[in-house]
Amino acid sequence: MCFRTKLSVSWVPLFLLLSRVFSTETDKPSAQDSRSRGSSGQPADLLQVLSAGDHPPHNHSRSLIKTLLEKTGCPRRRNGMQGDCNLCFEPDALLLIAGGNFEDQLREEVVQRVSLLLLYYIIHQEEICSSKLNMSNKEYKFYLHSLLSLRQDEDSSFLSQNETEDILAFTRQYFDTSQSQCMETKTLQKKSGIVSSEGANESTLPQLAAMIITLSLQGVCLGQGNLPSPDYFTEYIFSSLNRTNTLRLSELDQLLNTLWTRSTCIKNEKIHQFQRKQNNIITHDQDYSNFSSSMEKESEDGPVSWDQTCFSARQLVEIFLQKGLSLISKEDFKQMSPGIIQQLLSCSCHLPKDQQAKLPPTTLEKYGYSTVAVTLLTLGSMLGTALVLFHSCEENYRLILQLFVGLAVGTLSGDALLHLIPQVLGLHKQEAPEFGHFHESKGHIWKLMGLIGGIHGFFLIEKCFILLVSPNDKQGLSLVNGHVGHSHHLALNSELSDQAGRGKSASTIQLKSPEDSQAAEMPIGSMTASNRKCKAISLLAIMILVGDSLHNFADGLAIGAAFSSSSESGVTTTIAILCHEIPHEMGDFAVLLSSGLSMKTAILMNFISSLTAFMGLYIGLSVSADPCVQDWIFTVTAGMFLYLSLVEMLPEMTHVQTQRPWMMFLLQNFGLILGWLSLLLLAIYEQNIKI
């Protein structure tokens, strides 16, 4: 009966899908063709290879195994010569070792086991054919473990990458396969259903063996060839941008800028740089709708020359893909490649050295710079605790604290408004690095400075109203009216150090507030009351420690995302957080001391809570490789900065009172202006920062 009529019903669909007949006696396909056909290494694939030819075997187990052994044991030699085929192994013995019988139909498991035995035969053919090794005397498990233990110095439970390469090297020499382009080992393992990074195990090795035998009989080169596969280049480009299967437009822009930055153009001088003004490298989303009409217009010098036009990433997508795509697949990228090469050859987008885009930070730079930044942040927080030690003059302490509070408000709100929010909205990417276009490309910065001016203006009005209208008898008060929720609002009592130094009870160490003053005058009650007070104080210290730890964790997360984006973003975010941490830690340290803790214990707890910033940092670095994740972290960070600066700290600056109100007013404004000015300069010149 015909071979195809004896197939089981379950194999019929596989044969319908594999309608193209392969022949090992004709021209051999390339690795690229094999990938496009998507051979799965299933029994149907192997049997179809055996069925090719003038006299396909019947679906009889013994006949099929004999044909397979002949094709494997006697592969076609070079120059089309076919020598005598002397099989060193009987088909019946091969079938019995694999667990099969002489029935008419081969099972999938048997075909895979036979393939594994054939791999062993190929590797040890010399010993087998010289009668030094008799395969009939061993069971299947022996050959399975022998292949898994191909290298004695590696794990015998898995077929490692090196062991797989060794096997493929044998097959390339054994079969007549092309050495120019080969299917890579990782691709072969993936097609064989191997997902573990350690390699094939006892259950998946037979599948891999069937795939190797099938593709080798089809003439496909496997493993490391003389030349890489065509997919290697696309995969390298995508992996360099931390992507796997798709690119975003922003990442394609980054790739184009990198290519234009590194390219050395030798071009006729009549191609002028001002041509780029007609069509900027980075196309604004709001201007994209006018692209077609603008390119059809004639310039003053005549029609627009495509040879001198610099196309943006979005325009290349429109030209080649004829549709607006937010994600670009590997096939789409291959289709666009001629346009990218043309842009490099024409030098239309070549940038001067002082305008070249900076490359994204490497992994070493991200982890190195961010670790240094968080270390400085930790030391800065300890500086805040050191300032508390000079609290003998309470009035001077309060003035210094308000100076840092003003600086924190300026840097936090400035970083959120001038850097984080524009970056989330993509305004940084729309800046055109053109001479004479400074005010146009930085226009959003001046508008945001107007917003900051409005905040500062109303702060001045309210502060002046309080200073000029409030009764003079209230100027001597030193409490923050109604603000007890944040640690910045707390001031030390002038007797704090003396009391702590003498080891007085916690009930006598109080913050300067009316309720606390009354409590300070009360004698220490019974032991029960004292114990209750100690429990309350311990709870307060724990709350401060937990809250400070979460706060520092969020700071580390923000710094990690910032340095993942760019070194400039990391610097600006670090400065903003550092200016905020000093007054924050001063307040927290004051609360810990006032709760009855000793100086050493308070410093230790403050230091331990600051270490959570490193935890947040490395989590932020690991999860923010995706630009989308970076944007969301920046969004939340901007909201946190605005809340801390405008909701928590700015009202404190408005209502705090002192014996020298005008001095405090000047110091607060000095801190505000210094913080905003620093972030303004960073927003303007951040591209010039070189680390």
Swiss-Prot record:
Task: Give yes or no: UniProt keyword Ion transport.
Answer: yes
**Gene Ontology cellular component annotations, sorted alphabetically:** extracellular vesicle; perinuclear region of cytoplasm; plasma membrane
Q: Which GO terms describe its biological process?
A: intracellular monoatomic cation homeostasis; neural tube formation; neuron projection extension; regulation of microtubule polymerization; regulation of neuron projection development; signal transduction; zinc ion import across plasma membrane
Renumbered ranges of motif XEXPHE-motif: 580-585
* Top-level taxon in the UniProt lineage: Eukaryota
Q: Does the record bear Amino-acid biosynthesis in its keywords?
A: no
* Extracellular topological domain: 1-202, 391-398, 470-538, 624-631, 685-691
Q: Which InterPro entries would you find in this protein's record?
A: ZIP, ZIP4_12_EF-hand, ZIP4_N, ZIP_Transporter
Report TM segments.
203-223, 370-390, 399-419, 449-469, 539-559, 603-623, 632-652, 664-684
Q: Where does the entry say this protein is expressed, by tissue?
A: Expressed in brain and eye.
Q: Which loops or segments lie on the Cytoplasmic side of the membrane, by the record?
A: 224-369, 420-448, 560-602, 653-663
Pfam families to which the protein is assigned, alphabetical: EF-hand_Zip (PF21116), Zip (PF02535), ZIP4_domain (PF18292)
Mostly located where?
Answer: membrane
GO MF annotation terms: monoatomic cation:bicarbonate symporter activity; zinc ion transmembrane transporter activity
- Which reactions is this enzyme annotated as catalysing? Zn(2+)(in) = Zn(2+)(out)
User: Which compartment or compartments is the protein found in?
Assistant: Membrane
Which keywords does this chain's UniProt record carry? Ion transport, Membrane, Transmembrane, Transmembrane helix, Transport, Zinc, Zinc transport
Provide the membrane topology annotation. Multi-pass membrane protein
Assigned protein family:
Belongs to the ZIP transporter (TC 2.A.5) family.
**Free-text function comment from the UniProt entry:** Uniporter that promotes Zn(2+) import from the extracellular space to the cytoplasm across the cell membrane. The transport activity is temperature dependent. May play a role in neurulation and neurite extension. May play a key role in maintaining intracellular zinc content at levels that reduce the inhibitory effects of rises in oxidative stress on spermatogonia and spermatozoa viability during spermatogenesis.
Protein name, as recorded: Zinc transporter ZIP12
Native species of this protein?
A: Homo sapiens
Give the classification, highest ranks.
Eukaryota, Metazoa, Chordata, Craniata, Vertebrata
The gene is SLC39A12
